[in-house]
């Protein structure tokens, strides 16, 4: 497997719709306001994806138990805003602005941006498997004892694209993966 460079990512986004919408280069200034942004868009060997304006923040209002086999949404409060405050030692879900279509011979890894990591915010996104498509559900943990702010429409994580030496026998689409073509924030289900 080899990591793919900016030229390949650009070509796949522009001719195959691999990333929509696609920012061809790093965007770190808001064109309308001149405000500095946490960067997003095409980089040398990856693509920095953005958070949408929709968030789900864990809360324990109903004294719930988090069980991935029997998950209920009463563990969350839903927020739609340009920012989201994650309580101390808590967790939020969000989704990407970008819609991804992964080629059959590609696997991605997604790594949190250092700007957030240096503030104690850890981003977890599982790999995008061959022929998976959808909006990315993003998990964000606030590991600090303080409330933490995250920003919609700004960078949150970098996607790295790895091309396989050989084609896989069965793709995510062919095995009918449960998160195929997910829209919005998709909570766990078995």
From Swiss-Prot:
Its EC number is 3.5.4.13. Pathway: Pyrimidine metabolism; dUMP biosynthesis; dUMP from dCTP (dUTP route): step 1/2. DCTP binds at residues 113-118, 158, 172, 181-182. InterPro entries: dCTP_deaminase, dUTPase-like_sf, dUTPase_trimeric. GO terms for molecular function: dCTP deaminase activity; nucleotide binding. Homotrimer. This is dCTP deaminase. It comes from Chlamydia felis (strain Fe/C-56) (Chlamydophila felis). The gene is dcd.
